[in-house]
Design a protein with these regions (language model features):
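Hydrophobic/aromatic side-chain positions at a characteristic register within alpha-helices
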Residues: 27-38, 70, 74, 107, ...
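Extended alpha-helical scaffolding segments
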Residues: 148-153, 161-201, 205, 210
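Alpha-solenoid helical repeat architecture
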Residues: 13-18, 52-61, 95-101, 133-142, ...
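Short C-terminal boundary/hinge segments that cap the last helix of small helical domains
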Residues: 2-19
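Solenoid-repeat scaffolds in large eukaryotic assemblies
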Residues: 36-42, 78, 115-116, 156-160, ...
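Amphipathic alpha-helical segments of tetratricopeptide repeats
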Residues: 43-48, 84-90, 123-130, 161-172, ...
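C-terminal non-catalytic interaction modules
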Residues: 195-243
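Mid-protein regulatory/catalytic core that forms ligand/cofactor-binding pockets
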Residues: 44-152
Length: 243
C-alpha cells in the first residue's frame, strides 16, 4: 500500500478514534459541569457496549470508571482494570491517536513507574508524532498532564523532566491555553516544593486569564484543583500541630 505509516495508523484506528473522541466529549461535559449522574449513565452505556467483545470497548469503559471515580469520590475501578489498561498500552507496538488519548486521560491513576516508562517512551518518540500535525497539541497536553501529575505526587525530579520537555515544545502565540496551564503548573511546582506563597497568587492570575478568555467551566476546574491543593496542605498543617 502506497501510504505513509502515520496515515496507515490513522486508517486502522479511524473508527476507534472517532468513537473515543465522542466519548471524551461527553466525559469532558460531565466533568466541567460536575454531572455525576450523567457520567453514571455514560458508564452504563459503555458497559453495554462491552458485550460486543471488542478490546477497545473494555478500555473505554475503564477510562469512564476512572474519571467517574475522580469526579464522585466513589469507587468504580479496581487493580484488575488498571492491569488491563497497562497491558493494553504496553501491548500496542505502534501507538496511534487512540492510544495517545487513552494514556493522557488515565495517566494520573497508573502506577508511577509504569506511567514514567510509558511517558518517557512517548517523549522519546515525540518527534515522530509531532510530524502528524493533529498530534502536536495532543503531545503537549499529554506532557502538561504528566508534569502536573508528578508535581501532585511530589515526584519533583520527574516533574523537572517533563518541564524540560515542555520548554522544547515552543508553544506558539495562539496556543494560549497551553501557555497558561504550563505557567499554572510551574507555579504549582514552586508552591508544592518550596511553599512559595507568591506562587498561589500567580496560579490565581492564570485562572483569572482563563476566565477572561471566556472558558468559565475550565476556570472552575482549576479553581477546584487549587482549592484541593491548598486544602490538603491545610489539613497536613493541622495534623502536624496535633502531634
Amino acid at each position: 500500500i502506497n501510504m505513509p505509516i502515520d496515515e496507515f495508523m490513522y486508517a486502522v484506528h479511524d473508527f476507534h478514534r472517532d468513537e473515543l473522541n465522542e466519548l471524551l466529549a461527553q466525559v469532558r461535559k460531565c466533568v466541567t459541569t460536575r454531572d455525576i449522574e450523567g457520567m453514571k449513565r455514560l458508564l452504563i452505556s459503555q458497559m453495554e457496549n462491552e458485550g460486543k467483545r471488542e478490546k477497545f470497548h473494555h478500555i473505554n469503559t475503564i477510562l469512564v470508571k476512572i474519571r467517574l471515580q475522580d469526579l464522585s469520590g466513589e469507587k468504580y475501578y479496581n487493580e484488575t482494570d488498571l492491569d488491563d489498561l497497562t497491558d493494553y498500552l504496553f501491548g500496542v507496538e505502534y501507538w496511534g491517536y487512540y492510544e495517545l488519548l487513552i494514556f493522557m486521560n488515565t495517566l494520573d491513576v497508573l502506577k508511577h513507574d509504569v506511567f514514567m516508562v510509558l511517558a518517557r517512551e512517548m517523549s522519546r518518540r515525540s518527534d515522530f508524532y509531532k510530524e502528524i500535525p493533529i498530534n502536536r497539541r495532543l503531545i503537549s497536553t499529554m506532557l502538561l498532564n504528566a508534569y502536573i501529575t508528578c508535581i501532585e505526587k511530589k515526584k519533583f525530579m520527574d516533574a523537572l523532566y517533563f518541564e524540560k520537555q515542555l520548554k522544547q515544545c515552543f508553544f506558539i502565540e495562539t496556543e494560549i491555553y497551553e501557555r497558561l496551564i504550563f505557567l499554572y503548573a510551574q507555579n504549582l511546582y514552586r508552591y508544592q516544593k518550596n511553599g512559595n506563597k507568591i506562587a498561589i497568587i500567580e496560579m490565581k492570575k492564570c485562572i483569572g486569564a482563563i476566565k477572561l478568555a471566556g472558558s468559565n467551566h475550565l476556570a472552575k476546574i482549576y479553581e477546584g484543583h487549587l482549592k484541593k491543593v491548598l486544602g490538603e496542605d491545610s489539613r497536613q498543617a493541622d495534623m502536624g500541630k496535633k502531634f
